Structure formats: structure tokens, C-alpha cells
């Protein structure tokens, strides 16, 4: 099994909120006002203390699932047995090419998907979608834009399952339950930004 500890993670990138240790790579943490490097035993999941807040339970669950997924994947593929960070995507931030590659890497995508499977098995997700009358899926405009009423449904569904909005969207995409639509359809019809007709 994995050991879970909470620390004040003090890496240079503030979006690093969790770390699965391989027993070799040091992690910057803040203890007693001092920034130090610590090598945690292999199989230790280090979570940032911010995730202990009550309003962070969905993020905490997804992040634990994400790090657990890295552990499962590493057992199947020893080449991936490296210290792994869970980075939160910040839409307000400008990322370097290197940071983008790290965020969108195959191993991170695998861990996100596996975490969403742990938290939202298909049969549970189907029941929740039926409850919210969207069992055939929901339209998504462009990369990730939802009509306000669909966004509200997604938030209610995420709350019902104890997951974040982002985790639910990842799972729905994986299962092909988001129906892609051109963003211009939303802009012209729903927001009525298409000008006079």
C-alpha cells in the first residue's frame, strides 16, 4: 500500500500539489518557516496541506486517485517508476513548452484517466447521468465550453459523486459522453453573438 502524508510543498511551481516518491528524488517542503529538501520513502504520497481544507475534498480525492494511479502504472511499467508530481492546470498562467509537455504527458494523462475510473465507475456515472436527464451525453463547444444549463448539471453531478467538475469532464470525455460542437454554434446561437440574421 501507499503511505499518505501532508506537507507544505515548496517547489518552485506552485501548481505542484502532490508527489509520489520513488525514494530517490528530493521534494522541497516548508517546515517551521524553512525551505528544505526531503527524500520520502518509496511509495509515499506527499499531499500539500491546502488539500486538507474541507472545501478541497473533491480535489483531494482526485489527487489521491491520481497518485494511486501512478503507483499502479509503475507496477505495470517499471520505466515509469520515477517521482511523479500532480500539477493543477492554471488557465491564468502562461506555460513554457517544457511545462506544457509535462502537464500533457502520456503518464499524466493516464493517471488522470485512471483516477477518474476509480472515482466514477461507468455504472455509477450512468445512474447519475440518468438522474440528471443527460444519459445520452452533453454537448461541449470547442475544447471545453458548456452552455450554462449544462454546466449547472455537470456541477450538480460532480457534487453528487464527490468529485471535481474537472474530474467529471475528464471521465465523460474518456467515455465519449461529450458531444463535440463547433464553438461558433454556441457563440452565434446561445450567446447570440452572430450579428443580425
Where do the language-model regions lie?
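Active-site hotspot residues in diverse enzymes, especially metal/ion-binding acidic/histidine motifs
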Residues: 1-197
Amino acid at each position: 500500500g501507499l503511505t499518505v502524508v501532508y506537507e507544505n510543498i515548496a517547489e518552485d511551481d506552485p501548481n505542484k500539489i502532490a508527489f509520489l516518491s520513488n525514494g530517490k528524488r528530493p521534494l522541497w517542503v516548508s517546515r517551521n518557516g524553512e525551505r528544505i529538501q526531503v527524500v520520502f520513502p518509496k511509495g509515499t504520497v506527499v499531499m500539500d496541506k491546502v488539500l486538507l481544507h474541507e472545501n478541497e475534498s473533491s480535489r483531494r480525492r482526485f489527487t489521491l486517485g491520481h497518485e494511486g494511479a501512478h503507483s499502479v502504472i509503475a507496477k505495470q511499467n517499471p520505466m515509469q517508476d520515477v517521482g511523479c508530481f500532480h500539477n493543477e492546470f492554471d488557465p491564468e498562467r502562461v506555460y513554457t513548452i517544457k511545462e506544457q509537455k509535462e502537464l500533457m504527458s502520456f503518464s499524466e494523462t493516464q493517471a488522470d484517466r485512471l483516477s477518474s475510473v476509480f472515482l466514477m465507475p461507468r455504472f455509477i456515472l450512468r445512474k447519475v447521468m440518468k438522474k440528471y436527464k443527460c444519459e445520452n451525453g452533453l454537448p461541449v463547444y470547442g475544447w471545453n465550453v458548456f452552455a450554462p444549463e449544462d454546466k449547472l448539471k455537470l456541477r450538480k453531478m460532480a457534487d453528487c459523486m464527490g468529485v471535481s467538475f474537472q474530474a467529471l469532464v475528464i471521465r465523460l470525455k474518456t467515455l465519449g459522453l461529450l458531444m463535440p460542437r463547433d464553438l461558433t454554434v454556441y457563440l452565434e446561437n446561445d450567446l447570440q453573438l452572430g450579428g443580425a440574421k
